[in-house]
Amino acid sequence: MTLLRGDDFFTSRAVTVAVEPRTPQTAFPEHYHDFWEIVLVEQGAGVHVFNDQPYALCSGSVFFVRDNDRHLFEDVEGLCLTNMLYRSPRGFRFLSDIAAFLPYGPNGEWQGQWQVNAAGMQQLKQSLNSLAGLAQSDAPEAIAASESLFLQILVQLRQHCFQTEGNGSERQGVQALLGWLQNNYSEEVNWGGLADQFSLPLRTLHRQLKQHTGMTPQRYLNRLRLLEARRRLQQSDDSITTIAHACGFSDSNHFSTQFRKAFSQAPKSLRHQAFSREE
């Protein structure tokens, strides 16, 4: 597995933050870093596999990545994102500790998958452009200004994001709906009911989901289900039928057809490959 080193991305060893745009982000194999980063997806689609857990990417997706996390990008389609790098939560010159602004849950668990709304993303892009300029200098005043702006960006993320691990029931709009789908993909979905739940006209729901994900709502839902099914096939001993039902497919034959269409491989073949690698 590849280790990405901060010396290849930060302007100098004195600099504590960096901005790395990826326009586009191509498929990239599993890797880890000796620094921390925040990944903000501006547009496009793809799959982000984070510590063996797959996530479907869309505009507004945000991922907080620690130095001990493993991740990769695959199945990308017009994916554009920006990486905001920092040494560590305590690796700043003028900030003492940013842990309070990082996505720790009430019991200390890491909740690093967020969704940001469109207005928030526009504000963040402006701040990131300014930060990219400041991060080119290792003058003390530039480092102080870049760390100050970095903290402002963390505050902006808090204001405009929410964790996709939550059920999103208290929030409205397409971003909340995306978070709900990430957490409830296995349920039977009534799009009209969800439109009411998230205060969206049904036609608006279909149009905005297509804009954010590049897919129709049903195709995006199936994508979430298939990604989770692939993970379970590789990591569990459950039968293919059990996995299909657990991921929201009522018919295992239909599941197998959809799986082959998405991954050019039958579920049984993937299961066999996964077990062969372990032997």
Curated annotation (Swiss-Prot):
Its main location: cytoplasm. InterPro entries: AraC-bd, AraC_XylS_family_regulators, Homeodomain-like_sf, HTH-like, HTH_AraC, HTH_AraC-typ_CS, RhaR_RhaS-like_N, RmlC-like_jellyroll. Residues 175-273 form the HTH araC/xylS-type domain. It is found in: Cytoplasm. The record marks 251 as: Interaction with sigma-70. GO terms for molecular function: DNA-binding transcription factor activity; sequence-specific DNA binding. GO terms for biological process: positive regulation of DNA-templated transcription; rhamnose metabolic process. Residues 192-213, 240-263 bind DNA. One of its GO terms (cellular component) is cytoplasm. It comes from the Bacteria. Pfam families: AraC_binding, HTH_18. Keywords: Activator, Cytoplasm, DNA-binding, Repeat, Rhamnose metabolism, Transcription, Transcription regulation. Activates expression of the rhaBAD and rhaT operons. Binds DNA as a dimer. NCBIfam families: PRK13503.1. HAMAP family: HTH_type_RhaS. PANTHER family: HTH-TYPE TRANSCRIPTIONAL ACTIVATOR RHAS, HTH-TYPE TRANSCRIPTIONAL ACTIVATOR RHAS-RELATED. This is HTH-type transcriptional activator RhaS. It comes from Pectobacterium atrosepticum (strain SCRI 1043 / ATCC BAA-672).
